[in-house]
């Protein structure tokens, strides 16, 4: 499918769950999932399988979603982040493959909600963290690190506005000093890092006010409205038992060979930390400049191309971080759009 296509113009019988259609595993998403798991310092499951997640919602024409609950493709990863409070490791609980659902589009003028099934059946990789975040700053730092990793790996272009990088935030509050986590809500429709920061601030205030007023925080899925700067209830949040998971009968279990894994390990590119070290050593860049240049793959590609053409590395770096970034900000252009 393509971003921006007219609704329901990129569909097939498999997407819409027509009787008699059977799913087929996309080999490329398996490669991308393994590469991502390795880049996130996770353990790849050599023998994994798929499950059916059963629920009824208008954007899911089959009334079930092919996913991985019991034996996901990757587990126990780790991402190191740096904030004003210092360095911290964010634990990755699991990484699993699943198919995308459709999209509901609400028309306020007609007071109608319509279904767009263009995304149905498109494979995706979902990364689930442990509840290690304590501030919005940590969440954004993690997402920036994740975006950089996925771009370097060539797994995704990470355009949040186009949905190729999405983030659902699960949030709960608890009294200071308490070890027990509170009732969580899940927030969707978060299309930018700024929206994520604002949504976390709003939902934190809402839950605290709810508890202070003697009300109960409901476990539910909430939709972030960027224009109203608030979250709104979408539906109750089910537990795993409510989805009645069972093994997917139409996709056989996967057995990954060591040869397959070694081949993907060999394809792992030079990542941001290694490039930072090399730029400081070979080009004499400061630690801060090297960190800024390597933060996004698009900046690295531009820098490398300019230096390869004979431009002095330090001059290129200073121009990019100064004049170029200023112009991009003024014109609201992302580096990857250059």
Predicted feature residues:
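Basic, nucleic-acid-interacting segments
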Residues: 1-269, 281, 287, 308-312, ...
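Composition- and surface-driven signal marking solvent-exposed, interaction-prone regions
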Residues: 185, 291, 305-306, 332-334
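Long, charged low-complexity interaction segments
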Residues: 268-293, 298-302, 306
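Residue-level detector of well-ordered alpha-helical segments, enriched
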Residues: 289, 302, 312-320
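Generic structural concept
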Residues: 294-297, 317, 321
């Amino acid at each position: 499918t393509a971003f921006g296509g007219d609704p329901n113009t990129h569909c097939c019988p498999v997407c819409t769950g027509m009787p008699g259609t059977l799913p087929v595993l996309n080999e490329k998403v398996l490669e991308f999932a393994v590469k991502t798991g390795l880049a996130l310092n996770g353990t790849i499951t050599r023998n994994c399988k798929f499950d059916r997640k059963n629920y009824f919602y208008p954007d899911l024409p089959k009334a079930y979603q092919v996913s991985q609950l019991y034996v996901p493709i990757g587990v126990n990863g780790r991402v190191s982040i740096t904030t004003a409070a210092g360095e911290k490791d964010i634990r990755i609980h699991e990484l699993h493959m699943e198919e995308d659902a459709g999209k509901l589009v609400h028309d306020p003028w007609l007071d109608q909600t319509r279904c767009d099934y263009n995304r149905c059946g498109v494979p995706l990789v979902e990364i689930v963290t442990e509840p290690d975040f304590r501030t919005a700053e940590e969440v954004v730092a993690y997402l920036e690190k994740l975006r950089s990793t996925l771009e370097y790996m060539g797994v995704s272009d990470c355009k949040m506005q186009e949905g190729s990088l999405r983030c659902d935030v699960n949030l709960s509050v608890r009294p200071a000093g308490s070890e027990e986590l509170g009732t969580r809500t899940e927030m969707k429709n978060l299309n930018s890092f700024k929206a994520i920061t604002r949504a976390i601030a709003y939902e934190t205030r809402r839950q605290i006010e709810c508890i202070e007023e003697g009300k109960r925080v409901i476990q539910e899925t909430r939709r972030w409205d960027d224009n109203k700067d608030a979250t709104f209830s979408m539906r109750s949040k089910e537990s795993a038992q409510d989805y009645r998971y069972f093994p997917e009968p139409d996709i056989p279990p996967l057995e990954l060979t060591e040869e397959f894994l070694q081949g993907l390990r060999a394809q792992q590119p030079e990542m941001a930390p290694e490039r930072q070290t090399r730029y400081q050593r070979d080009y004499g860049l400061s630690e801060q400049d090297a960190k800024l240049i390597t933060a996004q793959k698009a900046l690295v590609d531009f820098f490398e191309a300019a230096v390869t053409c004979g431009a002095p590395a330090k001059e290129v770096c200073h121009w990019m971080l100064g004049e170029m970034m200023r112009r991009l900000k003024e014109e609201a252009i992302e580096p990857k759009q250059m």
